[in-house]
Design a protein with these regions (language model features):
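Internal alpha/beta core interface subdomains
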Residues: 24, 28-114
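Active-site glycine-rich loop that binds ribose-phosphate moieties when present
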Residues: 15-23
């Protein structure tokens, strides 16, 4: 079961990750993966979902982790920094299920995470 950084109403699943463990597990190694998506993670388009993941979810997560990055300090947006404490080093966008893996999206009518 994985939590997403964002999802577009057009179907794209977006995950931003710092060390690759969350994005890797969404791509390989499991027979079935459930993606849990709260209503706050939904955006109308792919572009808006990606913007939300980078500029809302990632800065809040960096703050939660106590990182010394521009986004955590200011809390307002992604600065595309090169900080060694950067939490957004990898991006995976899923347009559909990966070959040989069953995927299911569970939409929850609550705000979940950032």
């Amino acid at each position: 079961m994985l939590f997403r950084s964002g999802m577009a109403e057009t179907g794209e699943l977006i995950n931003i990750d710092g060390n690759g463990n969350r994005v890797a597990s969404s791509l390989y190694g499991h027979k079935k993966v459930w993606f849990i998506v709260g209503r706050n993670k939904l955006a109308p388009t792919y572009e808006e979902a990606l913007w939300r993941a980078r500029n809302i979810a990632a800065p809040k997560n960096a703050q939660r982790l106590g990182r010394k990055t521009p986004c955590a300090v200011h809390g307002d947006r992604c600065y595309d920094c090169k900080s060694p404490e950067r939490i957004c080093r990898g991006l995976v966008v899923l347009w559909e299920a990966v070959a040989n893996m069953e995927m299911e999206v569970v939409l929850i009518d609550q705000d979940l995470g950032y």
